[in-house]
UniProtKB/Swiss-Prot annotation:
This is Hemoglobin subunit beta-1. Signal peptide: none annotated. InterPro entries: Globin, Globin-like_sf, Globin/Proto, Hemoglobin_b, Hemoglobin_oxygen_transport. It holds the Pfam family Globin. The keyword Heme applies. Red blood cells. Belongs to the globin family. Keywords: Heme, Iron, Metal-binding, Oxygen transport, Transport. Hb1 is a heterotetramer of two alpha chains and two beta-1 chains.
Length: 146
């Protein structure tokens, strides 16, 4: 993947201004509520039976924050995202057996949450760079499935 200086700047700016404790849980909650079949990968998280239960589940919140910190690793290694996620890809494919399509669903939910937070600052150019970044991450996480 080739990144322009503008794309690098946009991605860095987005992540440097995100409140991980707010955005991460919101994105994961949205994914688990909108796509309930994704809940099967979180059976150890306890009660996920209702949207309210999901939104107040501390394990969901903690994992949402963890996901954003994982994305931060990609921001810091934009020229080598696939290698950065090699071990994580193996974990998700071979141990956790996560359907790789779920990464795309979560990235879509994250895009919605970030867009809502940024408001008019989430321009088409910003969205294009953000979605390109997430597409590379999703591809890297799914690499071991191929």
């Amino acid at each position: 993947v080739v990144w322009t200086n503008e794309e690098r700047s946009i991605i860095s700016s987005i992540f440097s201004n995100l409140d991980y404790d707010d955005i991460g849980p919101k994105a994961l909650c949205r994914c688990l509520i909108v796509y309930p079949w994704t809940q099967r990968h979180f059976t150890t998280f306890g009660n996920l039976y209702t949207p309210e239960a999901i939104m107040t589940n501390s394990k969901v919140a903690e994992h949402g924050v963890k996901v954003l910190h994982g994305l931060d690793r990609a921001v810091k290694n934009m020229d080598n995202i696939k290698a950065t996620y090699y071990d994580l890809s193996i974990l998700h494919s071979e141990k956790l057996h996560v359907d790789p399509d779920n990464f795309k669903l979560l990235s879509d939910c994250l895009t919605i949450v970030v867009a809502a937070k940024m408001g008019s600052g989430f321009t088409p150019e910003t969205q294009a760079a953000f979605q390109k970044f997430l597409a590379v991450v999703v591809s890297a996480l799914g690499k071991q499935y191929h």
